[in-house]
Regions:
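Phosphate-binding and adjacent anionic-ligand microenvironments
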Residues: 1-145, 150-179
């Protein structure tokens, strides 16, 4: 999404997961819009600081209805392929230690085409997608998300990130999040 935000004149920023953290960061930056992959969407205008799925849907409809061809606007948005939120159960306190190990290993594992960020766990960005492994803020699990511009990119990124995870937690059982 970052390239699409830049093309529209915005300034994207990656930040820590958690609705209260995102809202606070939006206030610091005076950001008009913020969101998380979990679906929390925050609008500064007319509804500052609250996230509500119905409201976000209505605002999207309001915004695209201003256009001559709303379908063209929606069809122009970037498409991608992603996993649902995945979890790896851990012992109490283990997720943060594992995350630190992943962050330390990343520079020796990934080549120069991969950009690593340690703002919230380990996120590795490639030109065609990203992988994220972070400690949950609420439960003793690692949270994993993978996204690619194509199915092939998604599978490659997921395989590379899971291979890295295997180095710090051999035999890790990856399962769907229980939401």
């Amino acid at each position: 999404w970052a390239p699409a935000i830049r093309e529209a004149g915005g300034v994207p920023e990656m930040y820590k997961t958690g609705h209260s953290l995102v809202k606070a960061r939006m206030r610091e930056l005076d950001s008009p819009l913020g969101g998380e992959m979990s679906g929390h969407i925050f609008f500064k205008e007319r509804w500052y600081g609250f996230d509500d799925g119905t409201y976000a849907g209505c605002r999207l409809l309001e915004i695209v209805s201003r256009e001559q061809d709303p379908s063209a606007v929606l069809n122009a948005l970037p498409t991608s392929f992603s996993t649902p939120e995945l979890n790896v159960a851990c012992a109490e306190g283990e997720p943060h230690a594992l995350t630190a190990q992943l962050q330390a290993l990343a520079p020796e594992v990934f080549d120069a085409s991969a950009q690593s960020s340690t703002i919230d766990g380990l996120r590795v960005d490639w030109a065609d997608g990203f992988g994220l492994i972070r400690a949950s803020n609420t439960t003793p699990v690692l949270v994993l998300r993978f996204e690619g511009h194509t199915q092939a990119a998604l599978h490659r990124i997921e395989a590379q990130m899971l291979a890295l995870l295997e180095r710090v937690k051999p035999g890790a059982q990856v399962g769907s999040a229980a939401h």
